[in-house]
Amino acid sequence: MTIKAVVFDAYGTLYDVQSVAAVTDEAFPGYGELISQIWRLKQLEYTWLRSLMGRYEDFSVITRESLVFTLKALGLAFDTAVFERIMEKYVHLDLYPDAKTALAGLKDCKLAILSNGSTDMLNALVRNTGLDTILDATISIDSTKIFKPSP
């Protein structure tokens, strides 16, 4: 059997979600790593809970809500400019160092991302990191309105 297509998750598979720590540490010195870890845990928690409750929200909304929760839980005051600068990093996440090499090794296959990310977030991220020239498709769960994994 010949493999014709390979589908990857985006966040945590091709893209290092912890790469936001540099931006969060710049905004809140000494808190960067902690912010990025709590933020990611809240994102996952919110997607799971929303799926179970049948109350879908776009992943960009979840990402914003998760960051607000994180900053407030840590008692960190923030203004709109700081908040938006941190949020912007989510469409400029770092690729894992071996991601492009791994994808290049699969050049005979159709390649795609299937992700909880919103269509707009994923398209911007893929474009900003140059994967738009490598991937054949970027698939968001937006159309199903339920986050993975889904029972």
Predicted region positions:
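Active-site neighborhood of HAD-like aspartate-dependent phosphohydrolases
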Residues: M1-L41
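Short, glycine/charged-enriched secondary-structure capping and boundary segments
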Residues: V20-V23, V126-G130
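A metal-dependent, Asp-based hydrolase signature
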Residues: E33, T47-E84
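Conserved H-loop
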Residues: A77, D132-D136
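Substrate-recognition element of Asp-dependent hydrolases with the DxDx(T/V) motif
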Residues: T80-H92, A99-R127, A137-S143
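Hydrophobic patch in the ABC ATPase nucleotide-binding domain
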Residues: L95, L131
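Conserved Lys-Pro-Asp/Glu-containing loop-to-beta segment of HAD-superfamily phosphomonoesterases
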Residues: I146-P151
